């Protein structure tokens, strides 16, 4: 299972570079995506949690029990922020290590893409040339009709449209033929690229780097757990005043209710 996860992660990193190679864009790094998602999630939890606490304090039950949960919310929020930062640093180390370990795979895939692009380029240029020739051919046939339209009377408009229709259909059909030819020509290169990627994945799975990375990943997970312990302990300590306050309020309410029943 770990091997599958690492292979998928390697493909994700290599795929990001391949997409950048073809599209010439500037994609976010894997760490940026994870960090942005984690920050938004924790911020949403803190914001919504604060709203729920304020609503509970303002409710009739909260006022009756004198919960005052809002008094402890800032402390809990600070602990959550610290926990977020601790996890963030550890996770960034993991992504940096993973990207470094798979740099050779990204380089090989980039070279494969460059090779396939070089082979495909003549077919793309030929396709563009053929389409351009068809467009020019269409223009040459249409040009006399345009002159005829300008020089002729309005009643000839319908006749002109009837002449244009088959020419447009002919251009469409001939362009489709060129597209089919291009698709047939590019099919072997698509299969070649698929086989190359499969080969690179097999090399990755059989390499000593993957086995070594298994050990590093296990060590990292253990380290992550150790780093999380202090933050979780702080969170537990921050919750204790809230729980004690809640417990005292409930016991006080029960005591008052018992006294009222005894007085009756």
From Swiss-Prot:
Tell me, which GO biological process terms does this entry list? acylglycerol homeostasis; cholesterol efflux; cholesterol metabolic process; lipoprotein metabolic process; phospholipid efflux
Keyword Lipoprotein appears in the UniProt entry = yes
InterPro entries (UniProt xref): ApoA_E, Apolipoprotein_A1/A4/E
Q: What is the predominant subcellular site recorded for this chain? A: secreted
Tell me the ranges holding the sequence repeats. Answer: 67-88, 89-110, 111-121, 122-143, 144-165, 166-187, 188-207, 208-229, 230-240, 241-264
* Keywords on record: Cholesterol metabolism, Glycoprotein, HDL, Lipid metabolism, Lipid transport, Lipoprotein, Oxidation, Palmitate, Phosphoprotein, Repeat, Secreted, Signal, Steroid metabolism, Sterol metabolism, Transport
Is NAD included in the keywords of this UniProt record? Answer: no
The name under which this protein is listed is Apolipoprotein A-I
Q: What is the lineage of its organism?
A: Eukaryota, Metazoa, Chordata, Craniata, Vertebrata
Name the gene that codes for it.
Answer: APOA1
